Amino acid sequence: MSSLQRSAPASQNVSLPLEQVKEALGEVLNALQSPTGSARLEEARENSGNDLGKVLQLLLPAAVQIQQEVLQNYGFSPDGEGVLRFARLVKSYESQDPEIAAMSSKLKSFFLPPLPLPPHAGLSAPSS
């Protein structure tokens, strides 16, 4: 097993350089888009409908589990805490690297359903 794939104790903070974060993020996205990952997420989406509560109960845990399976290969604990630590690490690199920012945005789209724009009732367009 390479040093990249050693598991870190859950209490250990994992720090990866930018390129490894990009690699891990790419693997997470690939896992979510794989036939198996897509099927798991689609089933959760169908069972959730447009109910945000059900999205949190069904879709979010499925997506987190898929991430855990990848992130443990990068030394993160295979639990929700490992996913949160990775999310914080990604966030710290978003402003430094536009590719990481774009990949992070794509990752978030797996968790959050598209929200409709709120109506702008009572607001009129400025007159010229």
From Swiss-Prot:
Where located? Cytoplasm
* UniProt keyword terms in alphabetical order: Cytoplasm
Annotated Pfam families? P_C10
InterPro entries for this protein: P_C10
Covalent S-S links between cysteines: none
Main localization is cytoplasm
Q: What is this protein called?
A: Protein C10
Organism the protein comes from: Xenopus tropicalis (Western clawed frog)
Q: What is the lineage of its organism?
A: Eukaryota, Metazoa, Chordata, Craniata, Vertebrata
